[in-house]
């Protein structure tokens, strides 16, 4: 529960935290943000809202964040751009939409982005990822991305892995990313 999370601040070498359950709320994020060496955080099926994500902005060392089945929508995603050192982000079974992806555009250190099981994410949202030049891994599985959305990925020259299972991308859509010479997956 939230009150138990205060104990995490007493673990000076703690780097990875996985929290799940609806009894984890915004209040608990106050304590999580105070873990001095926090690097990776996984929030699965929690009740954390925009206020809780806003509290994480003081977690300077946070490089990896997973939001799985959490109450994450576009208004909550806007706080992610306050995490300038974030390198890996997973948005799984969230309420995020294409419009919400604009809040990721400033995450220039992002190297991996996994968005899956998100029917409200389509090609129009992919345009917001076009300037994430350090992106090496992008997963858009089980989204509404189609051929037209892939045109926005042309400038991601460091992209090595692109996962598109469960999308409406066809062979002709893949022509948009054919010039990405570092793609291996």
PLM segments and residue spans:
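Concave beta-strand-loop units of leucine-rich repeat
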Residues: 1-185
């Amino acid at each position: 529960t939230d009150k138990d999370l205060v104990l995490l601040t007493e673990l000076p070498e703690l780097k990875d935290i996985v929290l799940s359950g609806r009894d984890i709320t915004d209040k608990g994020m106050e304590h999580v943000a105070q873990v001095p060496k926090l690097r990776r955080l996984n929030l699965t099926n929690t009740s954390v809202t925009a206020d809780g994500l806003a509290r994480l902005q003081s977690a300077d060392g946070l490089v990896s964040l997973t939001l799985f089945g959490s109450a994450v929508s576009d208004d909550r995603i806007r706080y992610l751009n306050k995490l300038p050192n974030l390198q890996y982000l997973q948005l799984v079974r969230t309420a995020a939409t294409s419009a919400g992806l604009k809040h990721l555009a400033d995450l220039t250190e992002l190297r991996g982005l996994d968005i899956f099981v998100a029917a409200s994410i389509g090609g129009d949202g992919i345009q917001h990822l076009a300037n994430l030049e350090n992106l090496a891994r992008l997963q858009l599985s089980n989204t509404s991305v189609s051929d037209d959305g892939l045109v926005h990925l042309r400038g991601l020259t460091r992209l090595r892995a692109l996962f598109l299972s469960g999308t409406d991308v066809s062979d002709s859509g893949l022509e948009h990313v054919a010039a990405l010479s570092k793609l291996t997956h």
